[in-house]
Amino acid sequence: MDVHIDNQVLSGLGTPLLVHLFVPDTVMAELCPNRVPNCEGAWCQTLFSDRTGLTRVCRVFAARGMLPGRPSHRGTFTSVPVYCDEGLPELYNPFHVAALRFYDEGGLVGELQIYYLSLFEGAKRALTDGHLIREASGVQESAAAMQPIPIDPGPPGGAGIEHMPVAAAQVEHPKTYDLKQILLEITQEENRGEQRLGHAGSPALCLGLRLRAGAETKAAAETSVSKHHPALENPSNIRGSAGGEGGGGRAGTGGTVGVGSGALSRVPVSFSKTRRAIRESRALVRGIAHIFSPHALYVVTYPELSAQGRLHRMTAVTHASPATDLAEVSILGAPEREFRFLISVALRISASFREKLAMQAWTAQQEIPVVIPTSYSRIYKNSDLIREAFFTVQTRVSWESCWVKATISNAPKTPDACLWIDSHPLYEEGASAWGKVIDSRPPGGLVGAASQLVALGTDGHCVHLATTSDGQAFLVLPGGFVIKGQLALTPEERGYILARHGIRREQ
């Protein structure tokens, strides 16, 4: 769980309020069914439910590991920054959504969305009756960690999830030491003002005495070195490191030359206060139901950390609102707003195809040479195929769609830079393939990339949507027939897409 420490100390976020998570592999498999991701980072942002907009994207660390107490549970440890309601430091909106986009060496793994309600309530319950998985020493794990971890019951009718009380038994174990523990003990004694370096016979005492003996021996050796000039430091010393090594007195004062001992002052070892606090803190875990899926997530809390203790004081704004205001609250505010935005753009692209096809007397030219000569055209008026193709393009939407990637791309602004293609099975016979990139820099646009698109035209079970960075759109039908359209976005829509993917720039 060192990744939680790194996020708490090194993330550099504007808010110290973090909810630490463990995401099981069963949840990650929903995001990326093709491989077991080994993520080292995630991009997080909050989608507001009560207003349009979202927070800036921030990067947090992530690491794959095993959840203590559940040897069969492997997954990804990470943290989620959460934000209070505007002007109300102790209130949060339970219907805000935290979006985490995971990445590994293979690229994007997927996006996980979590309601603030799950994060805050899971953290509060973990602080009150969470399962102990690490003692306060911060070095040894509790033997009670091998017992089942309590998980909140899922929604009615969902799969049953076990619930266990807090493990109160404390089991004695032989104490073990490592270098981190020794340095930690020395630091604690320094903070308490003690002069000894550990109790009798402890590794901290042995290490401290040997380090002190080495320093004193070196100091004695340096002192015994004869000096050939008062203005010089001891041989092999860095100039100025030993202080005033013998500067003569001021003129007319009759000052004498001072000779220093050459011994360097000891600097106490110091760690980040936050890092030390979280290492010394207990670790409590609590399972929560993930509202967007039937799976469970786990919230890990560190009670001795002051920033974590603040989570226990947070209250949902719905608890402080009158019943009349609650009637106007939309639980699906953020997800619904995003879905409507994606659908609206897809409908406009489909409408441009329909308009172009009507201007061509409902005929489409074969631009991809499959089997039939390219001069062949086909009439699609009142065609079941074109009706199903339009319906598929209008209803299958994603933030990984080709037109989204074309919008956020940094490719040169030329008509023939790159093509991004979505492949959709007709009649809902399978999953879609999103945002495949095809290089079309040779002149000719879609025709110039025809050799790379032959496989798309020969697939009689799929319809393909292609877009370019300059706003061109193409609908590729079975047989290589192509309908041309347009991707038109307002500056506000383009800015929202860029902000959703962590890009802030003038358009």
UniProtKB/Swiss-Prot annotation:
A Gene Ontology cellular-component term: viral capsid
Query: What subcellular locations does the record give?
Result: Virion; Host nucleus
Residue spans of biased composition, Gly residues class: 241-257
Question: Where this protein primarily resides, as one coarse class?
Answer: virion
UniProt GO BP: chromosome organization
**Start and end residues of each stretch annotated as Disordered:** 219-257
Q: Which UniProt keywords apply?
A: Capsid protein, Host nucleus, Late protein, Viral genome packaging, Viral release from host cell, Virion
The subunit field of the Swiss-Prot or TrEMBL record says: Interacts (via C-terminus) with capsid vertex component 2/CVC2.
Q: Quote the function comment for this protein.
A: Capsid vertex-specific component that plays a role during viral DNA encapsidation, assuring correct genome cleavage and presumably stabilizing capsids that contain full-length viral genomes.
Descriptive protein name: Capsid vertex component 1
